[in-house]
């Protein structure tokens, strides 16, 4: 579990498509450097969020660490575009002594979005985004949380009528100085994790409705039957 408060920015040292070393596991691995500040208490097997993707440390030293990448992660995120020199946001998994300053972030990226606009507003930057996979747009609400490249941000506007749907965030100067997004340009991809709360609420509503519909004497079925009967009576009495 993470908070979306980026601890430091690291740099991709290597993206190995087939790492047959013991720590590579005969799969894709990525090595990230300039990460010494978050490795002082690191252990093999620890979780680190890299641009919002929860990844497992398989090897590390004083300044860099290696992680394994699954096919599912490649499909969901923009990890395939990380090449030598790419800067990435880094955050360790939360511990008992960490203040919870952002929001509940799993590190399970849902999809990617493209930056479609960026403009200054005072000392802030307003970024606009469009999702690759539109089924996640229903979880994006004004003043709700969203995790973009591992950064906890607040949605300031949702525009469902624009082509493909768009949403916007405002990034203050302090955040600009400590995350990678200001380095990106229009058209670049970012990783998106929507707020888990919306998914949980949707799931509970669906389960409740399914349960109600499956029972003939349920409150919902009784209500629907009464409405239908009333409509039929009104129609016949015309």
UniProtKB/Swiss-Prot annotation:
Gene Ontology molecular-function annotations: riboflavin synthase activity
Residue ranges the record marks as coiled coil: none
Name of a matching Pfam family: Lum_binding
Binding site for 2,4-dihydroxypteridine 1: 4-6, 152-154, 170-175
GO BP: riboflavin biosynthetic process
Keywords tagged on the record: Phosphoprotein, Repeat, Riboflavin biosynthesis, Transferase
Domain of life: Eukaryota
InterPro entries documented for this protein: ATP_synth_asu-like_sf (IPR023366), Lumazine-bd (IPR001783), Lumazine-bd_dom (IPR026017), Riboflavin_synthase-like_b-brl (IPR017938)
Residue(s) carrying Phosphoserine: 95
Function: Catalyzes the dismutation of two molecules of 6,7-dimethyl-8-ribityllumazine, resulting in the formation of riboflavin and 5-amino-6-(D-ribitylamino)uracil.
More info: Present with 7300 molecules/cell in log phase SD medium.
SUBUNIT field: Homotrimer.
Name of the molecule in the record: Riboflavin synthase
Organism of derivation: Saccharomyces cerevisiae (strain ATCC 204508 / S288c) (Baker's yeast)
């Amino acid at each position: 579990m993470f908070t979306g408060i980026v601890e430091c920015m690291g740099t991709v040292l290597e993206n190995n498509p087939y790492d047959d070393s013991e720590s590579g596991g005969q799969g894709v691995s990525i090595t990230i450097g300039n990460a010494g500040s978050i490795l002082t208490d690191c252990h093999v097997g620890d979780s680190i969020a890299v641009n919002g993707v929860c990844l497992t440390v398989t090897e590390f030293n004083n300044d860099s660490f290696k992680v394994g990448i699954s096919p599912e992660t490649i499909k969901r995120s923009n990890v395939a575009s990380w090449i030598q020199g790419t800067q990435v946001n880094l955050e360790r998994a939360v511990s008992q002594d960490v203040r919870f300053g952002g929001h509940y972030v799993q590190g399970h990226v849902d999809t990617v979005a493209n930056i479609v606009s960026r403009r200054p507003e005072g000392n802030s930057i307003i970024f606009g985004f469009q999702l690759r996979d539109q089924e996640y747009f229903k979880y994006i609400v004004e003043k709700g949380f969203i995790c973009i490249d591992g950064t906890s941000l607040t949605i300031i506007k949702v525009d469902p009528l624009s082509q493909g749907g768009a949403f916007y965030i405002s990034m203050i100067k302090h955040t600009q100085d400590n995350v990678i997004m200001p380095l990106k340009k229009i058209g670049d991809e970012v990783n998106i994790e929507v707020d888990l709360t919306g998914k949980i609420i949707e799931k509970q509503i669906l389960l409740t409705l399914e349960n109600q519909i499956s029972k003939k004497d349920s409150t919902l079925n009784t209500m629907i039957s009464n409405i239908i009967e009333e409509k039929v009576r009104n129609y016949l009495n015309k």
